[in-house]
Regions:
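Residue-level signal for alpha-helix termini/capping positions
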Residues: 1-2, 66, 195
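Glycine-rich phosphate-binding loop
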Residues: 5-24, 117-150
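Core catalytic loop region at the nicotinamide-binding pocket of NAD(P)H-dependent oxidoreductases
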Residues: 7, 201-202
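Anion-binding alpha/beta catalytic cores of soluble intermediary-metabolism enzymes, centered on
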Residues: 8-72
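Conserved short-loop catalytic and cofactor-binding motifs
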Residues: 12, 49, 82, 174, ...
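Rossmann-fold NAD(P)-binding glycine/threonine-rich loop
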Residues: 20-46, 138, 143-201
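Glycine-rich phosphate/diphosphate-binding loop of Rossmann-like nucleotide-binding domains
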Residues: 51-141, 154-165
Length: 202
């Protein structure tokens, strides 16, 4: 995408069936990949070299931790969910901040025990209520990235919020939690991309 008037592009997936996702991603310049979906952007997240932009939601998790003064260094973090959109990038961003990270998923043996050991728990499995009371420990920080619709048609996260609120040190709600921060991260990425394009220092 060579149009100099465009500074950032978002790719909403799944794409229509007639479009080749790999070809679309290959056509997207890393400098305009403001949501970290291309292989080049993800490689920079995994290598920790600071080039490109990480996926906005994964970075939003770190922004929340920074805002509330939670320092990841030396902390035991558990991520539930292994997608390239949230789970894996969030794990890499935490590793780059010196956390000790365990990445779990819906087929992890004894998921509850893994979760209970965490000081920081990021739920991004895409399964409503997968993180229940049996997964939680006092004092934990829990970031719920899940977006699901329950049987009553309500928007809910991956975490049983009522159970978490009674036990953990802090938990993000759904809706009204990570999503708002994700939007702010996206806006910052676009602004940064525009500034780089114009050779302006922010």
């Amino acid at each position: 995408i060579l149009d100099g008037a465009i500074h950032g592009c978002l790719l909403f997936r799944p794409l229509p069936r007639h479009l080749d996702e790999a070809a679309v991603c290959a056509a997207l310049s890393p400098v305009k990949d403001v949501d970290g979906i291309t292989s080049g952007s993800l490689a920079s997240v995994f290598s920790g070299d600071g080039q490109g932009y990480p996926p906005c939601t994964a970075q939003a998790c770190l922004e929340l931790l920074d805002y509330y003064g939670f320092e990841p260094t030396g902390r035991r973090a558990v991520g539930v969910g292994r997608s390239l959109v949230i789970g894996r990038p969030a794990a890499m961003l935490l590793l780059n901040r010196n956390a000790t990270v365990t990445l779990c998923h819906t087929r992890t043996a004894d998921l509850a025990a893994e979760c209970r050991r965490a000081e920081l728990l990021i739920a991004a499995a895409g399964r409503a209520g997968i993180i229940g009371a049996n997964c939680l420990s006092p004092g934990q920080v829990v970031i719920d990235v899940g977006i699901n619709v329950d049987a009553a048609g309500h928007l809910v996260g991956d975490v049983d919020f009522a159970a978490a609120e009674a036990v953990v040190g802090a938990v993000t709600p759904v809706p009204g939690g990570v999503g708002a921060v994700t939007t702010s991260v996206l806006a910052r990425h676009v602004l940064d991309a525009a500034a780089k394009s114009a050779d302006i220092s922010l």
